[in-house]
Amino acid sequence: MKGVDDAFLGVGDKPGLDIWCIMGSNLIAIEKSLHGKFYTGNTYIILSTVELKSGVRQHNVHYWVGEEAKEEDCLTASDKAIELDVALGSNTVQYRETQGEESDKFLSYFKPCIIPIQGSLSSHMRIYGDKSKDTTMFRCEGEHVARVTEVPFSRSSLDHKAVFVVDTESKIFLFSGCNSSMQTRAKALDVVKHLKENRHCGRCEIATIEDGKLVGDSDAGDFWNLFGGYAPIPRDVQDTVMTELMTTSSKKLFWINKRNLVPVETNLLEREMLNSDRNYILDCGTEVFLWMGMTTLVSERRTSVTALEDYVRCEGRQSNARSVILTEGHETVEFKMHFQHWPKNAVPKLYEAGREKVAAIFKHQGYDVTEIPEDKPRHFISCNGSLKVWLVDNGSVTLLCTEEQEQLYNGDCYIIRYSYIEDGKDYHLFFAWSGLNSINEDRVAAASLMSGMIDSVKGHAVVAQVFEGREPEMFFLVFKSLIIFKGGRSMAYKNFVSQRSDANGWYQKNGVALFRVQGLKHDCIRAIQVDLAASSLNSSHCYILQAGGSFFTWLGSLSSPSDHNLLDRMMDKLCPLKQSLLVREGSEPDRFWEALGGRSEYLREKQVKDWPADPHLYTCHFEQGLFKAKEVFSFSQDDLVTEEILILDCVEELHIWVGHQSGVLSKEQALDIGKMFLQAGIHQDGRRPIDTTMYIVTEGDEPRFFTSFFNWDYSKQTMLGNSFERKLAILKGISQKLETPERSLRKSSSSSLPRRSPGTSSSEPTTPEQRAAARTFASASTGKLLRERSPAALSPSLSTPSPSPRSRSSASSSPASWNSTPSTVARRLFPPSLHASAEAVATGTPRRR
């Protein structure tokens, strides 16, 4: 390829890393066994290739600059990164990484850590590792990736906010500053393990020192003797430069005209401001983006990269502002979030396109292929469990009989409990299902009553909040057969309808109704009543039309034979004694259209299935009263630390994992944090619907459908203590007594255990930031928790009920009283009366309606 280095030809075809070192104008490929070993006097280019579930390859290019690297090597690296982008079709994202200020994404490639080696690499030498026996000292920061910096071996290098590792000939000391988080201390133990295995061949002692702890600790005495005796450490000084960059809200946009920056005057950033024939610089404080239009020349892009580096250098921010270079059409979420209403990308449906190509090949070779078998979903839940369904009505629940639990109404809310045995353990999966037309009062009651039911079961409980139209496949799996009718049976919904005098569309046994039939072959089947109109039809689906005493089964022209089989099975469920008239699309009789109110246009195009989304893990916290979420790259089970709450984002559903020491006091609060995450629009092109399915998974209660996202080690699931104590026990080979701690969030919140030091095992908050987290999560609220599309929002009489003891007790929990940011006063998110009544009615007797 013209203008591209030969070293880049054919790269990026396989997932993994490719690394080159800049040697003058040449590129020296680094073999796999030496990945992660960087010299301070060199510059490197790193290509990360990831194959997404869609089959698309994602490329990230990083060029790493050592603190002693030559200026000409840095310029060569930026030019070579542009060449690599061209070789890969101009669809990469490029990051400039400076030694000591690397991004979390970059550091995640080289877990547990990278420790740059002094000097430079020549093309005639090999790296055998640092064999020096001299005492070295490292500063460790970071909670999910270790940010390691070698510092002078001196007492003056110590401070209270970081963790330090001192590596001597016979012993490795870990010193934890009193203001360091438990997660940082635990992550620093990974560095200790790395040094022990690579510098000491696994043979050395490990000592942990706590800042300020001296009495009766021989290891502390040995540690301070290295520095000539103990002396107080000065107080930490705040980094005002970084704080100013992080708190600034102003953004600067420039377009590049022959290395000159021309400001774009605007108050709000819009996508339309970026022209495809220009390159732009967007300065966002801690990050500086270079956006390159798709029609710009390679020479213009190289000039723009130089302009970017000049800009950062002139601003004096080489060390604290990260440069990100991207091409039009391949923008990162972090970049798009700075703009108002960024349009969603129209990406090709490679998942379905590949299946169609396979079918075409078989047909060309003479095979009679009527249908390529669809991918069977992975079931990480037993389908042989027991099901119970409760109707939420007037602040209480009523257990439905077996015949009725497979018939839901879209004006009601239900609590579903599915109990099953997995690996010899009892699991209970709770769903709070809200119908499309259900009212806010029932929705709030369902979430609260479900939390009360959890305490009445033994075993491992997982909670899910589900809304009609957004249900996960697992919801339908537990039913196996389900019919959703229009209408409702709760008193609140009936009152709402009577006030509006609108009961049209309610299902009547001998009336007229249209049902869309879908399913997963023999695993589960569902029929959903839709609007009685021809516009509700879809060529990709099958339908049942009930017209009084007559039934039609309508086959869409794009539906499959398996869909037709599901249709026959649903007819047996819906009307077992009736014979239906089979109607194929395009040959409908007149009375079919008459029952639908006449002909009209409907969707006739093939509905292709999106590929499974790649999961992303985020850690959540509050910063100055504002909700923050940060992605954890290359995540593993070890990233689920007990002091945190993490969200596994699978796009169509969220798994909210709650650690025992996270400070989250109830499952309602965990749902509240999930809604904050959705409203923030993290990882997506704008905000997602608030009715996205959310699972609440408590530490120790992880079901298989959650652990399947990780390479799960069940022995870690039952360990006690904080994250530092657990990792230290593994490192020292100490076998813990494995017990099952209290799983209920609400029960653990009432614990009155005395406060303990970090060296003892307890779920009580032990550090200042843990206690602050507990206070923060206790007072956090979402703002608008309930869906805006609920019909109750349209009815003033329901949003402001008449005074009564019950309504007065729940007034403080109304949506109008919730703020968008945490307040200093803790408040209950749901009415306490609902919590109190839940256990009393959870085991009620079935009632037939």
From Swiss-Prot:
Gelsolin-like repeat segments: 30-107, 147-213, 262-335, 405-475, 527-566
Family, similarity comment: Belongs to the villin/gelsolin family.
Descriptive protein name: Villin-1
GO biological process, one term: actin filament capping
Subcellular location: Cytoplasm, Cytoskeleton
GO molecular function ontology, one term from the record: actin filament binding
Main localization (coarse): cytoplasm
